[in-house]
A protein has these predicted regions:
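Short, small-residue-biased leader/transition segments that mark boundaries at the very start
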Residues: 1-2
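A conserved regulatory-domain signal marking ACT and ACT-like small-molecule sensing domains
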Residues: 230-326
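Catalytic, metal-anchored helix/loop core of enzyme active sites in primary metabolism
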Residues: 69-71, 79-82, 86, 98, ...
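Beta-strand-loop-alpha-helix segment that lines the small-molecule cofactor/substrate pocket
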Residues: 5-46
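Conserved active-site and cofactor/substrate-binding residues in soluble primary-metabolism enzymes
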Residues: 26, 49, 53, 65, ...
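Rossmann-like NAD(P)H-binding beta-loop-alpha module
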Residues: 36-117, 124
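Substrate-binding/catalytic subdomain of NAD(P)-dependent oxidoreductase enzymes
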Residues: 96-192, 197-199
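A generic structural signal for well-ordered alpha-helical segments
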Residues: 9, 34-35, 99, 155, ...
């Protein structure tokens, strides 16, 4: 319905501004091509990052750069939940209920907590950053529903925090993208992004590193972004603002080839099970939390997803695993 009404408006020679990331991720390329044909504009700054002007930055300020990585905390609901879990020690269900009472989470929070919202946003941003067409359905996505209060205690012991990270990297004509909970160290610029705030990290071959930070949701930040697009449309009557999003497709790296360290929780006595763990995951670092008995954790070396899954299947009593990112 929304796609049809948007298409009719563009066909009638009217510019359209939207905050709907589902529509943009699914039909954005087609609608931009139609807008170009009709010499009008289809703008969607508010679809990613609320009031953070990341799309305009990618489309104008950073056009001299070849962007090879874009990643970020793109969902305020999940970031609020993970921040509260880390600070209060409460479990996921309790904090989700709190988020709903405060209006930070929908009655049906599935799109947020399962990572679908962040997935659509990183697909849009990747398409603009890489000048190609990245399909959100092809991005591996994992939500935060399995993150526990115990995971947070281990993260604290490691001097890290847990965030839902949307990450996309390009290497020549290949790219990899993933949305999943990760442990971040204090050296990460995203470590201190807390509450309902969002942040987008960009790396370009000329610019180097840059981070865009601000309110990722809410009526006023979204309204600010939509109003900015409306003004931009008014400034370009009869002229289409070119967007760096084409129908060219990059080769996607198989997720199982991607490498990083993993944090793993496992049942059992450390002294009894450690030889088995080290035989399976050599050179792993053991992590313990004094108040958690009958289990321990360990951090693996940097290995591929495929190798991790193969080795983890050999261990009984694995309670969970979280990727670790730099």
């Amino acid at each position: 319905m929304l796609f049809r009404s948007t298409k009719r408006a563009l066909e009638a020679g009217k510019s359209v501004c939207t905050s709907n990331k589902e529509l943009v991720a699914e039909h954005g390329l087609e609608l931009m091509e139609l807008a170009k044909k009709k010499k009008v504009n289809y703008m969607f700054e508010a679809s990613c990052g609320g009031g953070i002007p990341i799309i305009r930055a990618l489309n104008s300020s950073l056009t001299a750069d070849e962007i090879d990585r874009i990643s970020g905390i793109l969902n305020g609901t999940t970031n609020f939940i993970l921040t509260e879990m880390a600070e209060s020690g409460a479990d996921f269900d309790a904090v989700l209920k709190q988020a709903q009472e405060l209006g930070y989470a929908e009655r049906n929070p599935e799109a947020d907590v399962e990572g679908y919202d962040a997935c659509r946003k990183i697909a849009i941003l990747s398409s603009l950053a890489f000048g190609a067409h990245v399909k959100y359905r092809d991005i591996y996505t994992e939500g935060i529903t399995k993150i526990t209060a115990e995971d947070m205690k281990y993260a604290k012991e490691l001097g890290m925090t847990i965030k839902l990270l949307a990450d996309s990297k390009r290497d020549g004509e290949r790219f990899s993208a993933m949305v999943c909970p990760v442990m971040l160290g204090k050296d990460s610029p995203l470590y201190s992004v807390n509450g309902v705030f969002n942040a987008v990290f960009v790396h370009g071959n000329v610019l180097g590193d840059a981070m865009f930070y601000g309110s990722g949701a809410g009526k006023l930040p979204t309204a600010s972004a939509v109003a900015g697009d409306m003004v931009d449309c008014a400034k370009h009557l009869g002229k289409t603002v070119m967007m760096n999003w084409s129908n060219r497709e990059l080769e996607q790296v198989d997720r199982k080839e991607v490498t990083h360290p993993f944090f793993v929780r496992i049942q059992g006595n450390r002294e009894e099970r450690l030889p088995e763990v080290l035989e399976t995951f050599a050179n792993s670092k053991v992590v313990t939390v004094p108040e958690l008995t009958g289990e321990f954790g360990f951090v693996t070396e940097c290995i591929s997803e495929a190798e991790f899954e193969e080795k983890a299947a050999k261990l009984e009593g694995v309670l969970g695993r979280i990727r670790i990112r730099a």
